[in-house]
UniProtKB/Swiss-Prot annotation:
One of its GO terms (biological process) is tRNA pseudouridine synthesis. This is tRNA pseudouridine synthase A. Substrate binds at Y109. GO terms for molecular function: pseudouridine synthase activity; RNA binding; tRNA pseudouridine(38-40) synthase activity. The keyword Isomerase applies. Its EC number is 5.4.99.12. It catalyses: uridine(38/39/40) in tRNA = pseudouridine(38/39/40) in tRNA. Keywords: Isomerase, tRNA processing.
């Protein structure tokens, strides 16, 4: 049978999602826990492989197994064997045609900035600290030129292995809650470091170092060296993966934590 799981994880203590030799990964920890519950070796496939330090509240994985367990056993049982910074949020038996990566039609990320002169110890690792205040409205306006299907070479990491820089951005919204700036972006897929590179350049607009029109210019240049430095991984979260309705994949409130849609100044699409 094929099982899908919703996964939440704090990426601070991991070298990314993907299993690697001699370093901790989210995939390895999850496969070990699932293999214990299934009494057989389990290999998982995820919707999106996040980088070192990046967290997830809406990751989706699937695996195949000969073991027959109630759905709640896959959730509660697996959680009992996971470290505290990884958790299963739901479990569901799915059709054989479902694939966590290839069945997905879109991925959604949120990047959290904390604008304050002094950094926070409690929030360390979960947000990116910015000692300057940012103009969220200008950042939002600047980001609208990125909507639609376009060449994102200017926001693509040099080591990106994708065959094409073209991606289709469905929405990009920038909102503020007090001292927090939230960049919310959804696309069919993302090139390597795309969200963090976009955020790094939006910060330049938010501080007033660059005009709103600069983002359009960057996009047209198709040159990564002209854009701003990559934003830190600390504030980035994979918050949702979108699938066709026929798979009936469970939905959870978009987070992380207190950052639900209804609390943001700008309604999210």
């Amino acid at each position: 049978m094929k099982i899908a799981l919703g996964i939440e994880y704090n990426g601070q203590n991991y070298y990314g999602w993907q299993r690697q030799e001699k370093v901790r990964s989210v995939q390895e920890e999850l496969e070990k826990a699932l293999s214990h519950i299934a009494n057989e070796k389990i290999e998982i496939f995820c919707a999106g492989r996040t980088d070192s330090g990046v967290s997830g509240t809406g990751q989706v994985v699937h695996f195949e197994t000969n073991a027959v367990r109630p759905e709640k056993a896959w959730a509660f049982g697996t959680n009992a064997h996971l470290p505290d910074d990884i958790a299963v949020s739901w479990a569901k038996q799915v059709d054989d045609e479902f694939h966590a990566r290839f069945s997905a039609t879109a991925r959604r990320y949120r990047y959290i900035l904390y604008c304050n002169k002094l950094r926070s110890a409690i929030l360390a690792g979960g947000i990116t600290h910015c000692h300057l205040d940012l103009d969220a409205e200008k950042m939002h306006q600047a980001g609208q030129c990125l909507l639609g299907e376009q060449d994102f070479s200017s926001f693509r990491a040099a080591q990106c292995q994708s065959h094409t820089p073209w991606r289709n951005v469905h929405h990009l919204n920038v909102s503020r809650i007090g001292k927090y700036i939230i960049v919310d972006i959804q696309a069919n897929a993302f090139v390597h470091h795309m969200v963090r590179n976009i955020v790094g350049s939006l910060i330049e607009v938010g501080t007033g170092n660059q005009p709103i029109e600069w983002m359009q210019w960057l996009l047209e240049q198709k040159n990564r060296q002209l854009a701003a430095p990559t934003a830190k991984p600390d504030g980035l979260y994979l918050v949702d993966v979108i699938y066709p309705q026929k798979f009936d994949i469970p939905k959870r409130p978009i987070g992380p934590l207190f950052l639900e849609d209804g609390l943001l100044n700008r309604p999210l699409k």
